[in-house]
């Protein structure tokens, strides 16, 4: 601006011609832009350096769970047996004096379903975390077909487990690719079959591009129930020996829940299933239901046995039945 004003005065006083002023301004512009670009470049380099430091720190992290004691000869075929928990005590590493699990013991044979229920913080997810080997330091052992899971190579163990949390991650790609994420060499028919088992197929067919419909970052364009059913379809397509549903049916309605669980019983007749839930209808058909309180098993049995015991499970069942009935009356 100063250049233009002062240059204008020089032109008015006939010290410079208009052509000379225009040329001068053009030269100044050509000189100033590279200076701005250099400043911008230094800013980008500083930001890049800070990002690189964070990435380098992450890459330098040493995993706490390793295969140091694993038997390399164990294969997935060696894990087709019963799952047995014998946990005397477990505490999180940052609070070693506060046990969160105590005397957790149960056995599941292939084809059986386990239900885990209890209040928030009772220890349901912690039991699952130990099977996934998120923590290895505990008093006791968990065995799969007689083999301590800490002696099974991580890759082999996790290949036999499908885990569906309450809020699973979905990629910003198509529905079909999201379902097929954890499975190799699957075709469209396999994907559709898995979607049918999770009661998602009909919803997908109503979408503009079917299984090619983009879901957005973390399933932004889908409802909570659709996201959960897509995650279940992904797990069913993997067809692992052990399926874990960690409150993974919380966003679906009762009718859809019933259809999904019915499909699971048919498809997984010879495989193990673990269901952690707050809604008791999710576990009512389980072979074994464990009621947890403060990390301990306070009730165990099947649905009918727990109702007959008239403890926490029976009280919660009556309460949830009443809530469901009130909801139905309100809808009417």
Task: List where the protein language model places each region.
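A hydrophobic transmembrane-helix motif
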Residues: 1-22
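Small-residue-enriched core segments of transmembrane alpha-helices in multipass membrane transport
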Residues: 23-32
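Cytosolic ends of transmembrane helices, especially the final helix of ABC transmembrane type-1 domains
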Residues: 31-58
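Pre-NBD coupling/linker segments of ABC/ABC-like ATPases
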Residues: 63-78, 306
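ABC-type nucleotide-binding domain
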Residues: 76-332
